[in-house]
Amino acid sequence: MPSNTTASSGHKSGKKKGRRARLVVIVLVLAIVGGIGFGAYWSISTVRASFPQTKGTIKLDGLSGPVDVKRDGNGIPQIYAESDADLFMAQGYVQAQDRFWEMDVRRHMTSGRLSEMFGKSQVKTDEFLRTLGWHRVAKKEYDSKLSPETKKYLQAYAKGVNAYLAGKDGKDISVEYAALGFTNDYEPQKWTPVDSVAWLKAMAWDLRGNMEDEIDRSLMTSRLGPSQIKDLYPEYPYKRNKPVVREGAYDGVTKEYDAKGAATGTQTGAGGTGGTAGTGGTGGTGGTGGTAGSGLAGGAQAPNGLQSQLSGVSDALDEVPAILGPNGNGIGSNSWVVSGEHTITGKPLLANDPHLAPQLPSVWYQMGLHCRSVSDKCQYDVSGYTFSGMPGVVIGHNQKIAWGMTNLGADVTDLYLEKFTGDGYQFDGKVLPFTSREETIKVAGGKSKKITVRETNNGPLISDRNDELVKVGKKAHVDTAAPDRGDGYGVALRWTALNPGKSMDAVFDLNKAGNFKEFRKAAALFEVPSQNLIYADKDGHIGYQAPGRIPVRGKGDGSLPAPGWDPEYRWKGYIPQNALPYEYDPKRGYIVTANQAVIDDSDKAKYPYKLTSDWGYGARSQRIDDLIRSKTENGGKISTEDMRLMQMDNSSEIAKLLVPKLLKIDVKDKYVREAQKLLEGWDYTQDADSAAAAYFNSVWRNILKLAIGNKLPKELRVKGQCLNVEPAGNTGPADEGKKVRECGQRDADSAQPDGGDRYYEVIRKILDDETNDWWKAPATRTDKETKNRDQLFARALEDARWDLTAKLGKDVDTWSWGRLHRLTLKNQTLGTEGPGWVQYVLNRGPWNLGGGEAAVNATGWNAAGGYGVVWVPSMRMVVNLKDFDKSKWINLTGASGHAYNAHYTDQTEKWAKGELLPWAYTDKTVEKGTSDKLVLRP
């Protein structure tokens, strides 16, 4: 998103005026935020004008009774009301006080209207977002799917937001509006209930599953053969890394999942078992149980036209704002629950830490919503983490139950190559007309732009949003059996979130659920995004439910793009909710979910449906499992502090595997040997001050680059990495004279190999095969070719030494992982990718962090792109079901979205150290911790 708002100017005065406008914005922001005299008007008071009133009384038309807003020393509000409508109206008012700029940017993103705020620089992004149509689907949900009660709450929330906005200029709402006002005349508009619903679509997009893997597998075929692609998508290691659900089975008679049952033999009548091996195309298997032969490319080289289309789609995806974070292997969340049998309190403990992109302010907003007396008139007494712009609590607890979430990772998207003929597309031997609509994109400081969005029976044509793709599609050569050429090809997206659903109903039902039955009933409505839901209650029960709208496929397993003209590849429906896996009070006494496989679906007798071909590979989940078992063996008990320490576990699973091998390498160079010795006696923990962790992670990065990265096509490699390679598709003998120079095309956050736990499994499988072809790397001007594992390891040890010498200095004793692995928090829009002074004023950091890729303390980095932190535990919580007031929580930043407010980043230092804050819940404890009290009166 732009930080230089001068891009919104549509005048013809050229670069000089753009530079002048940019200087105005920079000077203005500095003047406002720093309190530099810019006339009487632009004084420090302009900054403080947008700070919320947190004491005294405010009259709020529309309330039926008084509402108390009690804030603790961190500015976290607890709201007390006598009716549901008053409660959610107050929630809207308070969140707008602290976070309206964030809310406004989000709703412009979800509706494809960023250009209205930031000008022509965002037109391409808006075109893609309009094509996806998040806001259109959200409106359909609101109009036709949501319950009357949910609509009432959404309306009350919107009323509260608008009550805050009433009579205020932009500069009174947030300092960013004051800066924006010098480049265009944008003014915030009223909030609508649909604005809140649309945020769930944005969530679903960033948590959509395996679409990038689907693209990558096809793009790999230009450089890799079927067996090589299979190597890079190994089977899930069920025996070593346990799935979430280990008890129960699908009942072939009742067609339901039975948490206490056993498989009843061959399953039939499951409505089609998507993911049947080897259907369509040719070639072997790929993905975690998926097939490389289940779509257009099969196991052979993807046709040139398909590769061009998918490369363009990948580029278009990079342009869409990453709301929650990068979408790839190793990214996800941790949540686990331990029954009272294994805890000091005798009641369950539940932990959760979702891994998302670092944002300022945090994507989460801590809040309590309390009815003074719970009744039919006022049903809620809930506390936890909310999203600014959306009523209710997303993760947290009420007076009876607690719940957490991690990304299920279900495959809910498919790409279809569509065959065009005239003004239509081919399907089942016929030409069908496109469904089309016209969209008008308004541009701040410029002319509006009209676009046409076309859809097939599979979904919107996302390839239309790339001019180059339109040209390529007309000339595409497609080898796969297809109808006559006609007028080219395009790529359509089918995605479960583009069908209206009831996920907003689920939020409110979760907030008032009182037992596991009510929890599961609410979970059944949580259709998108598909999340692992973990559960505990005051009565001592623990549980888990896999919800979501997950497709059942005919041919294909979703691991590769499918031919849109073939009806056999259409979805056949969705997995019934009562057939989705769950657990309730498992015998082992705990449940761990950290994006690993939900269930062993390789055994069709136990479970006939395919949830995905692309699970996370379970490095984090198994480490958590091991920590729980080690703590509870011989009757040991787990405390809240133990749960916190588990969340901060920095252990590197891949280091445990590789370091013994690396220490056996005979290193000749004394400076490289000096670095190698850092690994001797290392305990494999990636603390911020660890020199060994810094060196190992650099070695790991170089192993991946030499063994895998340099063999990938340019479409997957990081931008700026240029190699001399054989021409793509070359089948003749190697010829140095014919090599061409190819440079990577991927953004650093999404390039491959990213170093996630999929690559742990790739390297694990070939580690003992010392002459495997993956260990072979060509010679360079300074290095000899490597012909085996130890030669490649020696080269990686050397390359890492010089890499860190350049970055951290010659003296290895001064090295530390945290100096490489740094977190900078960037304010939305004005704090990202913009002029340095503006970033300096609005951003915070850096912090030197421990943890790493696929560690439990998952401070993620992309090995192809660098060492910097690209996703984090966006919050951490531990819920104590014995005494909610002894629960703990922390947010990445603070409650406020206002730069220089005391609560802008007041939790970040504690978060970085792994500390947690007290989490008050009962009236007495909240009152004791109250620093500010605001009364909202009708």
State what each model feature region is:
Residues 87-90, 128, 136-152, 494, ...:
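Second-shell loop/turn segments in exported
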Residues 369-401, 405-568:
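Glycine- and hydrophobic-rich flexible loops that cap the catalytic core of alpha/beta enzyme folds
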Residues 698-804:
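Charged, long alpha-helical assembly modules
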Residues 2-5, 10, 25-26, 31-349, ...:
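Substrate-recognition/specificity elements adjacent to catalytic centers across diverse enzyme folds
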Residues 110, 134, 150-160, 360, ...:
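Stable alpha-helical elements in mature extracytoplasmic
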Residues 526-631, 685-688, 699-713, 720, ...:
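Hydrophobic alpha-helical segments
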Residues 47, 303-306, 605-606, 610-673, ...:
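Terminal end segments
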Residues 1-21, 434:
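Terminal targeting segments of Actinobacterial cell-envelope proteins
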